């Protein structure tokens, strides 16, 4: 395990969104490099002010693109860390293009219809508190008035 991922062990990511707080338990045991990168981006303020650019009720809410279009990222691609962790309500996964190793900074939070993503998209977190805030996010691709991440920070 890298020093960065070791530092993230046992931590959570707290998203302050325009709909309320969302606490995500980080899962470094199954995706150490993704947890390390998400932690690094959050600590740098990268996610602050970024919108939820794709929200599909019954499926997922996606964010992490600084352009708000679904086409942007941080510029650093990550090698996939697929696992048997089952996607369910509140599971947080890394968005990617057709290439499995194209995850960057965009991620999604599942509602209920995500089971088919298991083993195909890297899981790096699980919402522990605040799914009610996620469920209130404005729907659309993109939403007419998208909700945003006000701040993202690591907590113990």
How should these model regions be labeled?
Residues 1-156:
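Cyclophilin-like peptidyl-prolyl cis-trans isomerases
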């Amino acid at each position: 395990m890298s020093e960065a991922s070791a530092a993230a062990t046992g931590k959570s990511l707290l998203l302050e969104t325009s709909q309320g707080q969302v606490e995500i338990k980080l899962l470094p045991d199954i995706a150490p490099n993704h947890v390390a990168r998400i932690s690094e981006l959050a600590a740098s303020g990268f996610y602050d002010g970024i919108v939820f650019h794709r929200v599909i009720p019954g499926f997922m809410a996606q964010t992490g693109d600084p352009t708000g279009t679904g086409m942007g990222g941080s510029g650093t691609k990550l090698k996939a860390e697929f696992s048997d962790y089952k996607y369910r309500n509140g599971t947080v996964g890394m968005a990617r293009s057709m290439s499995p190793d194209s995850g960057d900074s965009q991620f999604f939070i599942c509602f209920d219809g995500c089971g088919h993503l298991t083993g195909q998209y890297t899981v790096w977190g699980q919402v522990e508190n605040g799914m009610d805030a996620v469920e209130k996010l404005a729907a659309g691709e993109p939403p007419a008035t998208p909700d945003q991440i006000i701040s993202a920070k690591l907590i113990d």
